[in-house]
């Protein structure tokens, strides 16, 4: 049974990667029989590099991705250095769930409402300085600025909680407490210990998570459309615009752009690996020469992160009920629930679609993740983690076009099924990795004891293992739901524009619709995954089974 499920998992979540890449390569080379293109050519690539401003767009994407990734790494390490093992860290761990729950799109819309030239930040500045003070400027500072500074800040702030989450298992493996004790006995203080002893190991073991952040940053479209530069846009947005060109004869250009985006992402991964090698092995004199170290403002960084995130919900709520809000008034002069009443029926149907797809894809992904981990434990041959994580490490546009072509060849027009499958394809790696730590830390001797009592593997799993990992399973399921709710490109491309979710509606409205309607959809998109995290937190408040409970379970099994 387990091998059959594992093969089915491979067929659904891993093998489609190959036709996805092959499909986009064939289209980039000009071979698309459905469009009457039967000959291979490099015209698509020529059209890409002939596009005016292509060099600027590529350079901008490279700069934004690299800077946002390492700014997030700096924020993460600063928070860890100042708080790991202290009371502060307990508060940070508690706050990680709501921070992770806020989707990128909702955060970006709230960020735009806060830092736009007529946003809450400028309104507060007017109120503090002088209501008659005139400091408005047509030059954007953080929202759609030409250098992408706002996009860098949004990506860095949103990826910091993810890197913190990934760092927990890394630091537990490193046994930081013992390292601190040994180094302290040699006369090093906490700052020196973390910089010279912990940082090199932490950076190396966090490589995979950093690669995932880079892959997301280089291919992000939804957030870049909201706060990113527009003339030229980032390269992923440019490729997305090419995919939406009504002239289908130009489709090879879009496919070639997706290949170039994949190459750019690969280059960034190589640069990240080189930076890691230089810091830890190449130019490593700083690790042992002298005792200079400095305290990073980790607590201040976390306060900034939690403050910005906490401002988003009330700000979106305020905009959703604002009937009249002139600039530079700090608060609306008139309030009304009119826009909620007008949009409520549409919102309910959109929420229904979003939640249905998220529940189905996350539940199947959870089952697949359990199957994959159980198979890895029982059998020597299994798919390596880096292959399972390919959807996380490859730009989405570089895969989705090929997957879209694959669905067209099947001649099945059930778009809801294809969208759910696309969500499952991208949700599964996150759920699998969320369970990786708990499966590796689980004591297999407990299972062996149960099997030695003559019980079936399924009976032992349900009675012994499941109670031990139930909290992690629930948390991984909720992560899968939040990842599904945040999917933008898979919904649009595999749904052919016929499936609307909160994310697709919020991005579409953020590009120029009424701020009040935009705020309503962004608020719903922010609160929905938060509700699931609150649900998981409430369930997990029940204590995990203690050692005595496990022993009593073994005793009970032995007499059944």
Task: Please place each PLM-identified region on the residue numbering.
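Short helix-to-coil transition segments within interhelical loops
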Residues: 172-177, 181-202, 448-469
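Flexible interhelical linker loops that connect adjacent transmembrane helices
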Residues: 275-301
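Membrane-water interface segments at the C-terminal ends of transmembrane alpha-helices
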Residues: 2-33, 46-172, 205-222, 228, ...
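Short, highly charged, low-complexity non-transmembrane loops/tails of multi-pass membrane proteins
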Residues: 184-186, 286-288, 451-453, 547-558
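Glycine-rich helix-loop "coupling/hinge" segments at transmembrane-helix boundaries
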Residues: 34, 38, 222-249, 328-333, ...
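Short amphipathic alpha-helical coupling elements at transmembrane boundaries
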Residues: 43, 47, 93, 127-130, ...
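Membrane-interface capping segments at transmembrane-helix boundaries
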Residues: 174-177, 273-282, 442-445, 535-549
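Helix-loop-helix hairpin linking two adjacent transmembrane segments in secondary transporters
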Residues: 247-259
